[in-house]
């Protein structure tokens, strides 16, 4: 079905010409375009209108989970009758497999998978494979290795009313595509049999499937609510898809086992020729154990490291990823491209450096190298048409784009804020006075500093003046970051103090003041791009103001101020010509899509801390004490005081042991 855009608004300001230009560019076959839209100009609404006009499958890549969640909520509201999906990493906690040669320390992979996110990922894959009206909002997880789309497409079960089936064979097919027989009602990825009724609970949808048999014939089929078990829809036909991202056939397993064994023989021979007998023996034992498990169970821990053998790829060939599930004509939007593009470039290299030690010291076969994220050039080869979206596009986007579409005029008539430069002397006292005035107007403030410690200390200091403040930095996980921002928008706090996390894409119309402390410090946190992004945080409020605390004006500050003034001039002239009076954006609170995940947090932290406590045997007492102290302070900063106390008690024991020695 076509996309149906639901909105109370029509395109305004620069949006109509931006939509027309981008749609024309897509229709002309432009491979790369850039939407250079100032903060608050409605870039997301422009994207939504482009999607509606071209009516093709879409992938939107965001630089982090927080912004991905925000975009997901907005597109769900714009397209309630189409498929809007969410695809981010499904790990609540993830410790990758690693080997540290200097300490002879092997760290086994440890992970806690979030079932809710896993279900959302499977829903995204199923939607891409079965529909054209699909928008997937993803993080950079979109370029990581995924299951073979050919398996997902072929390993499904098609059923229709009146069809005759052999029940025992049908159950075997369900098991082959990842389902487990369970008696628990509604357990994701399971099925249960009660007389002539079969109930299936796929991972890619919330509803269960009920199949009623009459003898060996399908009599009726329904979808039903897992909780109250009410029938939702009667079905004439349906397709049951695999319940896991990684499923494969017995033939592929047999072929992979032979191929793995051949690579093992070759690598063991190579290690022995280099005089690495210990490494060769280790690799032989570990890999033969995996081969035995694969042959008997069809699965082993770390099976993803053998994905090249299952896929039939040659060494060095790119793995399958989410991109391979799409039709060739899909469109990619890269949001906040000035940070997402560098991330996409960096992912491959970080993964390779970790795996090098595992292969060289006999923990993994070289095929582990091929379970990886895509290289940047591989990513670019797999995408068809790309629209970069940013208020400050980077040099790569500007260089490759066949057109750059500017969106300077906001639909609300809001203009870029005035920027003041004030001396750093007494900057905190001056800041307190400014925040008090903001608070009186019922508005909010953001303060950006240079270090995490400063963010924490300043937030605590502001509380002493009856200013409700919280800090925001990289050590807070995605769920807690969303919570802090939601509290600001809901009026539960007055100020958020942060480091670089205040820059990108935060949609906070209640914020009328942005204060930049130590604005004249050289570095990436005070670069021209960063400063323009920070200034943009208050561009959604008619009382918007930015204060830079600095004792000199750096070149980066000057360029950011000049660009802001250029935009202000264009906006003010447009408003005067059309008789527009600026007004603050009114926006409802974002849907809290992370709500279902919170129940797992306590269990997740317990698993994480247990893994820390278990490292005692692998480290010296001094190293173990340092690790405990670091994690204790981290837990305290996240307000996990019980966890911090547990780590503190362990630290006291170790220090006593050190003193005795």
Swiss-Prot record:
Protein name as annotated: UvrABC system protein B
Instruction: Give any single GO term for biological process.
Output: nucleotide-excision repair
Which residue numbers delimit the UVR domain? 622-657
Gene for this protein?
Answer: uvrB
The role this protein plays is: The UvrABC repair system catalyzes the recognition and processing of DNA lesions. A damage recognition complex composed of 2 UvrA and 2 UvrB subunits scans DNA for abnormalities. Upon binding of the UvrA(2)B(2) complex to a putative damaged site, the DNA wraps around one UvrB monomer. DNA wrap is dependent on ATP binding by UvrB and probably causes local melting of the DNA helix, facilitating insertion of UvrB beta-hairpin between the DNA strands. Then UvrB probes one DNA strand for the presence of a lesion.
Q: Does the keyword Cell inner membrane apply?
A: no
- Quaternary data: Forms a heterotetramer with UvrA during the search for lesions. Interacts with UvrC in an incision complex.
Cysteine pairs bridged by disulfides in the record: none
Q: Which PANTHER family match?
A: UVRABC SYSTEM PROTEIN B
Q: Ranges for the Helicase C-terminal domain?
A: 430-594
Intracellular or extracellular location(s): Cytoplasm
What does the comment on domains in this protein's record state? The beta-hairpin motif is involved in DNA binding.
What InterPro entries does this protein's entry cite? Helicase/UvrB_N, Helicase_ATP-bd, Helicase_C-like, P-loop_NTPase, UVR_dom, UVR_dom_sf, UvrB, UvrB_inter
Keyword ATP-binding set for record: yes
Listed Pfam families: Helicase_C, ResIII, UVR, UvrB, UvrB_inter
Motif Beta-hairpin boundaries:
90-113
Report the sequence similarity comment from the record.
Answer: Belongs to the UvrB family.
Source species taxonomy? Bacteria, Thermotogati, Thermotogota, Thermotogae, Thermotogales
Q: Which UniProt keywords apply?
A: ATP-binding, Cytoplasm, DNA damage, DNA excision, DNA repair, Excision nuclease, Helicase, Hydrolase, Nucleotide-binding, SOS response
């Amino acid at each position: 079905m076509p996309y149906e855009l639901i909105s109370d608004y029509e395109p305004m300001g620069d949006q109509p010409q931006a939509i027309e230009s981008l749609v024309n560019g897509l229709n002309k076959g432009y491979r790369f375009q850039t939407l250079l839209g100032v903060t608050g100009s409605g870039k997301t609404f422009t994207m939504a209108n482009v999607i509606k006009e071209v009516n093709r499958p879409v992938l939107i890549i965001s630089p982090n989970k927080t912004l991905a969640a925000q975009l997901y909520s907005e597109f769900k509201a714009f397209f309630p009758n189409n498929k809007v999906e969410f695809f981010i990493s499904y790990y609540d906690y993830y410790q990758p497999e690693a080997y540290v040669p200097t300490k002879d320390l092997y760290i086994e992979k440890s992970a806690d998978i979030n079932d809710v996110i896993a279900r959302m990922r499977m829903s995204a894959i199923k939607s891409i494979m079965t529909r054209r009206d699909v928008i997937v909002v993803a993080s950079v997880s979109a370029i990581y290795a995924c299951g073979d789309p050919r398996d997902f497409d072929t390993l499904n079960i098609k059923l229709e009313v009146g069809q005759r089936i052999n029940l025992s064979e049908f159950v075997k097919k369900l098991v082959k595509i990842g389902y487990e027989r369970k008696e628990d009602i509604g357990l994701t990825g399971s099925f249960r049999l009660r007389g002539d009724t079969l109930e299936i609970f796929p991972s890619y949808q919330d509803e269960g499937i009920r199949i009623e048999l009459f003898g060996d014939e399908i009599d009726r089929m329904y979808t039903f609510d897992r909780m109250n078990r009410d029938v939702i829809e009667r079905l004439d036909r349906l397709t049951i898809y695999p319940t896991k991202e990684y499923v494969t056939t017995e033939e592929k397993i047999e072929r992979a086992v032979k191929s793995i064994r051949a690579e093992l023989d070759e690598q063991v021979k190579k290690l022995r020729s280099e005089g690495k007998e210990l490494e060769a023996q280790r690799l032989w034992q570990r890999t033969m154990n995996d081969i035995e498990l694969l042959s008997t169970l069809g699965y082993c821990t770390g099976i993803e490291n053998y994905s090249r053998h299952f896929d039939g790829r040659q060494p060095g060939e790119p793995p399958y990823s989410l991109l391979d599930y799409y039709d060739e004509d899909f469109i990619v939007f890269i949001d906040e491209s000035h940070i997402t593009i560098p991330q996409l470039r960096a992912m491959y290299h970080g993964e390779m450096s970790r795996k090098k030690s595992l292969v060289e010291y006999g923990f993994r076969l070289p095929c582990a190298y091929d379970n990886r994220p895509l290289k940047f050039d591989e990513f670019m080869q797999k995408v068809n048409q790309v629209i970069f979206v940013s208020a400050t596009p980077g040099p790569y986007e500007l260089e490759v784009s066949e057109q750059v579409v500017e969106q300077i005029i906001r639909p609300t008539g809001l203009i870029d804020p005035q920027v003041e430069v004030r001396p750093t002397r007494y900057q905190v006292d001056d800041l307190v006075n400014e925040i008090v005035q903001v608070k009186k107007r019922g508005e909010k403030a953001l303060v950006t500093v240079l270090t995490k410690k400063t963010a924490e200390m300043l937030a605590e200091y502001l509380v002493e003046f009856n200013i409700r403040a919280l800090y925001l930095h990289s050590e807070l996980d995605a769920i807690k970051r969303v919570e802090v921002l939601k509290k600001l928008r809901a009026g539960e706090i007055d100020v958020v103090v942060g480091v670089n996390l205040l820059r990108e894409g935060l949609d906070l119309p209640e914020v009328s003041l942005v204060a930049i402390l130590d604005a004249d410090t050289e570095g990436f946190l005070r670069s021209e791009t960063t400063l323009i992004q920070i200034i943009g945080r208050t561009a959604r409020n008619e009382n918007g103001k930015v204060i830079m605390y600095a004792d000199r004006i750096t070149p980066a500050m000057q360029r950011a101020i000049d660009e802001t003034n250029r935009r202000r001039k264009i906006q003010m002239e447009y408003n005067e010509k059309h008789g527009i009076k600026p007004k603050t954006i009114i926006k409802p609170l974002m849907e809290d899509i992370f709500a279902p995940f919170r129940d797992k947090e306590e269990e997740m932290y317990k698993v994480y801390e247990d893994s820390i406590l278990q490292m005692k045997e692998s480290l010296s007492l001094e190293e173990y004490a340092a690790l405990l102290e670091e994690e204790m302070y981290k837990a305290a900063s996240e307000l996990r005081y019980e966890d911090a106390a547990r780590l503190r008690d362990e630290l006291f024991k170790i220090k006593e042991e050190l003193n005795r020695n």
